[in-house]
């Protein structure tokens, strides 16, 4: 039975045929003024088999959102997937996949050196009690350990 085409790109992805971890271009959009938006699927865990626990995911979200901008001025957003298996990285007017992988690698290396989770307080975060620096580092370390496989999506 054929699955109907959905409006959301990731809903059209056969999650049974991917092999995490990976980084893939999930979408490209051209704006009316010529700007290019590229959205990357940065998958940490195998869909429907594993997921990131919320405190670790939440902390990694904060760390990467802050640190990645030290390496790339074109980053628009780093946001977690609701399924807790990965993140979306959105960039503006940048379309170099190899450079994105390098930026992600540098960012994850910096996560491993972090001494605190940025903005993990009640003034700057909506769930400040839900953080673990060590959990975020474990996720970053596992992702980096498979660096050679990031381009192998499996679809």
UniProtKB/Swiss-Prot annotation:
Enzyme Commission number, as recorded: 4.4.1.21
Q: Which GO terms describe its molecular function?
A: iron ion binding; S-ribosylhomocysteine lyase activity
**Gene Ontology BP terms:** L-methionine salvage from S-adenosylmethionine; quorum sensing
Q: Which GO terms describe its cellular component?
A: cytosol
Q: Detail which positions bind Fe cation.
A: 58, 62, 125
Q: How is the cofactor bound?
A: Binds 1 Fe cation per subunit.
Q: What keywords are assigned to this protein?
A: Autoinducer synthesis, Iron, Lyase, Metal-binding, Quorum sensing
The record's section on Pfam families has: LuxS
Record field: catalytic activity: S-(5-deoxy-D-ribos-5-yl)-L-homocysteine = (S)-4,5-dihydroxypentane-2,3-dione + L-homocysteine
| Needed cofactors | Fe cation
> Subunit comment for this entry?
Homodimer.
Job description of the protein = Involved in the synthesis of autoinducer 2 (AI-2) which is secreted by bacteria and is used to communicate both the cell density and the metabolic potential of the environment. The regulation of gene expression in response to changes in cell density is called quorum sensing. Catalyzes the transformation of S-ribosylhomocysteine (RHC) to homocysteine (HC) and 4,5-dihydroxy-2,3-pentadione (DPD).
Specify the protein name.
S-ribosylhomocysteine lyase
